Amino acid sequence: MEKWFRNWKSQFLLVAVAIGVVLAAPLASPNKAAADSVIISGARSLSDQVVVNFANGRNVRTTDVHVLAFNDLHGTLDPAGNNLYGRFAGGAAFLSKMVKDRQAAYANDVTVLAGDNIGASPLQNGLFHEEPITIASNLMHVDFASVGNHEFDKGSAELMRIQNGGCHADGCTGAPYALPGGGSTNIYPGADFQYLSTNVVKNDTGETLFPAYATKRIKSDSGKKITIGFLGEVLESTPTIVTPTGVAGLTFQDEADAANRVVQNAKNVGNAEDSPDTWVLVIHQGGFQSGTAVLNGCAGNLAGSDIAEIVQRLDPRIKVIISAHTHAEYRCTITTNGVTRLITSASSFGRILSDVTLSIDDKTGELVSASATNTIVENALNASGTGVIRQPDPSKADPEVQAVVDQYVAAAAPLANRVIGRIQGDLTRTASALGEQPLGDVIADAQLATTQPAALGGAKIAFMNPGGIRANLLRSDISPGGEAVGEVTYGEAFTVQPFGNSLVTKTMTGLAVRRLLQQQFRTGVASGSGPPCLGSTAPAGGRVLQISWTFRYESNPDAAACADKIGKMWVHNGTAFVELADTDSLRVTMNNFLATGGDGFTVFRDEASDALGGAQDIDSFVDYFRAAEPAGIAVPALNRIIPKP
């Protein structure tokens, strides 16, 4: 059970805690320049650092290890349309350039990604079964990755293929991939980095799906061997946001409990002297800054977030947390029971790189202090802004990864660059105070139009989950195909809806629809910590379904009782809106993810009947654009969800 990994000046031990097996062996690496001999582009001064000191006043000699971290790349090969803090940012080649520059500068480093490297991908990656972004990550010399919820979109067997290599059931569609000794093959070689799954267990064996933790060993400046342990986790609630087939046969454990168990038992596995002296948790769960986010800030200190609750229960030996999932950026410290921890997150789509410095005691191997800086991964000569067209800066891209990007952009171009229609204005995911989104309205309208005919479902209303809407459609965005302003390509539409879900139409009562809408919220104020309504998994702030034009309802997310959050409901009968009574029955369309209770909307699964399957969501979306020609799709008014008196 051995596998060789790219490595920089160290030796890895990958430990499957459940079975105590060594899974990898050492690999020699090129020399690196001293860290103080290279200027890192984009690095900030030490005055911008938040340093967490664990030495308790002790004066000790230390060795620095840099942990380079990113998350939620979601197969973003080409960076078109991504920006942050007024800068065009992200994309695999540009992220790779920054990562490689820092790897070359540091004497000791580890590169990790915190989940969702694959899944919900643009067409150029999704069309080739997530292989391109994995190859790009190999070229970045990523060492370890936590699994994210989207790693399970296609099931654990497909995730194992992503790790180990081999062709997809559709055939060997990628490449050609270079062979180490020369020549090439069209057989996908797998990930050179190791996925970790501390809290994901196979039901049939009780073992973790991937190794529960991995270690990196370095020599301190005084010659002592130092071992750093890396845990890799995903949110425990993954089964509520992934299709049931994606997580079949797996149990997702409490994050803190699983991490603590591994840390506490580590000395009992393998050679005791290889047990980590310092621990880093790489976890696909996160939080948000409150108010206006700052690149290296922590407004609100993650109060009330899922990641804060987990961090507060961690073993004191876990002092550095690389987090993810929320697509937010922050650099925070949280102190619990006298233990202060450093927590980072690097936004999404390769727009930010987190650089965490671990200062480790040369003699004991214990963590003395930790600091971190988030840096924007810029990719253009110009600043971003409304209506501004990006001017790419090739000097900021890694040529090796750019070649991969160019290869797959070209391969997907005949399909990706096909113009499917036009938009009259920007269709965004920006929500009203009650949670309605312009782009969400349009998607729900498209799915209704597809399933309205009696033979295709006879739908009266349609619902869309907000998490399935992955990107905005902006008039000024120009894809590699060079379409005109306002034109929408198939590739852009696919980026908005990349999951390949199919439409399902079911019969529901008015009461079931009311209960469904209540499941959007928690008890008490929407932003509070009350229990979710009717057994749902609604987060703080709610999870508001997007609705078709044929449906209206009154909403008060802050009502104390779940039963009081939804008021009157109306449905269009073909002539006018009429009130929907609890005793009425009607046909309702959703995607197959929602139909099976996804996102905690169990009413779709348990209180609906007579299911009829239908078209794929992307096909419905494309057909809707074509039907709107030549005028194009207008930006809808946000008047479908109205305040409850």
Describe the role of every protein-language-model region:
Residues 415-436:
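Glycine-rich phosphate/diphosphate-binding loops and the adjacent beta-loop-alpha structural elements
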Residues 35-378, 439-446, 462, 611-616:
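Acidic, metal/ion-coordinating pockets
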Residues 25-37:
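C-terminal region of N-terminal signal peptides and the immediate post-cleavage residues
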Residues 2-15:
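Bacterial N-terminal signal peptides that target proteins for export
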Residues 38-66, 76, 84-86, 90, ...:
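Feature captures C-terminal
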Residues 13-25:
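Bacterial N-terminal signal peptides
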Residues 369-395:
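Short, exposed interaction patches on small structured surface elements
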